Amino acid sequence: MLLEEIQSFTHFDLLAQKAKEGFIAGLHKSPFRGFSVEFAEHRPYNPGESVKNIDWKLLARTDKKYIKQFDEETNLKAHLWVDISGSMRYPQDSILKLKMGILGAGVIAHLLQQQKDGFSLGLFDEQGFLYRSSIKSTRGHLQQQIGVLSNHWNQTPKTTADTAASNINHQTFDSAVLQVGRRHLVVILSDLLWDPTETAAEAAFWKNMAMLRFQKCEILLLQVQHAQHEFQLDLGNRPVRFIDLETQSQIKLQPDEIQEHYLAFERERQDKIAQQCLQLGIDHFLSDVSEPLEQTLTAFFVKRSRLH
């Protein structure tokens, strides 16, 4: 399903279920299998067994083969965090980036509840979390969180912008991270756009990601993008008025005159994100609004299965 074809569809729950079915069709096993796995003990290796779980470091020290055994929790606990900040409301006439993040969270929520895994939903902007639910695995909990996502799906660009009003009480990102349990799964759907003049916000984000990894949490980072405009600056040769969706400041520029400098800056920014994810062991994937969501999610989890 392409977002441009379904953006005006109001029955969000049906959309999420249909996208989930398309996503599952592209996989051969549960996409969340193996997340809550913890090392338990060693046992001697028996000839003829698979060598997959041999502890090679222990072999080098003792010259004996031992198998690493793992305990897998029966129920996964997950946190779905969706960025609803101003930069996600692009393009202004269709808010495709925000809708991709919302639909992605809806699909994953359905998958988790289907497996009887508990999850919480969080919505955040540049000031922190506007909404965070408790962790539950019931059908009623799923329907409640789908309702929250549906409200944002069906909002107009204007009402969506009003959601991030400064008079709403926010929970800080730091506080939310401290409430995440050990070995939980955290899925973040965001464009990862920060004001380049305010480096503290970006540094704080990666500090919190490092804290989650220290707690042995798995992090799946789906970076939502409008590649044609944001990565390529493909806006034609006419003058364009650029509007900051978070501060509403404006500037009029000729795209082809700044394209070279902009693309160099964007490449450097993406390289930095990729490097941070690599260093922290975060599974990172780009999600373009021009691609079907099922294709994006399938590719994301296939990539993960090859890495783990």
PLM segments and residue spans:
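N-terminal juxtadomain amphipathic helix
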Residues: V51-N53
